[in-house]
Design a protein with these regions (language model features):
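Extreme N-terminus of proteins, especially the signal/transit-peptide cleavage junction
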Residues: 1-6
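Short, contiguous alpha-helical
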Residues: 9-71, 111-167
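Helix-adjacent hinge/juxtasegments
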Residues: 62-104
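Mid-chain, well-packed structural core segment of small domains
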Residues: 102-109, 118
Length: 167
């Protein structure tokens, strides 16, 4: 059985694949539809995913400045660089993840001014689930704009072992 830290690393490999698919989905929107408010909403939703990942890394002490939680007006061309920088920082953090870090409690100041305390495991679980939620929204927006929505469910990424030959 793999450790919980190993599972978080594996799940982040999956999330990185989903990030690439999300960028491809956004790029698939026809040029004539990119001026639509829904397109900017989809791009900004992806920027929010990046910002959320950075915000949690900041709260954990591994990102210098807290990002704006809901970026507006992000350019599609800016997303690949934002994603790459964020992924590199998360890979570096997760490479050092162990049971002691997962159990560590940390405190942070929320945007509403309240302070919270949580264990790292809970924060990583929230961050992972948060991405699933918004990727579904991005896929719906892309499909509505005439782009190619991609199913980013985990089952399509993991390596299943077929037991029977296809009929």
């Amino acid at each position: 059985m793999t450790s919980l830290a190993d599972r978080f690393r594996k799940w982040y490999e999956y999330e990185r694949d989903c990030n690439a698919k999300s960028l491809a989905m956004l790029a698939s929107v026809p040029a004539e539809r990119r001026g639509a408010a829904e397109f900017q909403k989809a791009v900004d939703r992806m920027a929010h995913l990046v910002a959320a990942r950075r915000r949690w890394l900041h709260r954990l002490g591994h990102w210098a400045e807290p990002p704006v939680p809901f970026p507006a007006g992000t350019a599609l061309t800016d997303l690949p660089g934002l994603v790459a920088d964020t992924e590199a920082a998360w890979v570096a953090y997760l490479d050092r993840l162990d049971a002691a870090e997962l159990a560590r409690e940390f405190e942070w100041l929320a945007p509403d001014g309240r302070r919270y305390r949580w264990e790292v495991e809970g924060a990583l679980t929230q961050t992972f689930g948060h991405a699933w939620y918004h990727r579904g929204q991005i896929a719906q927006l892309v499909a509505g704009l005439g782009g190619t929505a991609v199913d980013t469910d985990y089952i399509f990424w993991c390596k299943l072992t077929p037991l029977d030959s296809p009929a």
